[in-house]
Amino acid sequence: MKHFFIYLLLLTTLFSCSNYQKILKSDDVNFKYNQAVKYYNNTDFNRALPLFTELRPVFRGTKRAEELAYYYAYTHYSIGDFLMASYLFNQYIINYPRSSHSEESKFMIAYCHYQEAPEYSLDATNTIKA
């Protein structure tokens, strides 16, 4: 009988829908946005990235699009995808040139190229870009 309850608890845990899965399946975009920012602020970038990816086309042309683009670029940087992060920071500067984050984004483009640069004895393309 004791083993039955242990197996039942284990099966319930395995097949229950996690809170993150409920967020992903939710239709409320404002709730998803708030949860993505919460994950971002808690440095859980692997959970924030799919939410930001899903929300980008939804918020395009709104007031939140600028902030979302900034978070999205930094999320890529934080997971170590420096090539994509430099591209996204560049797109951020093109789309929002008068933003308060534009100077920081220019620095992050150079820093992402620096992170991508190999040793000095190898190809120096990213070093020159930085």
What function would you assign to each model-found segment?
Residues F5, L14-A130:
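Acidic, polar-rich low-complexity tracts and alpha-helical solenoid repeat scaffolds
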Residues K2-L10:
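Sec-dependent signal peptide recognition
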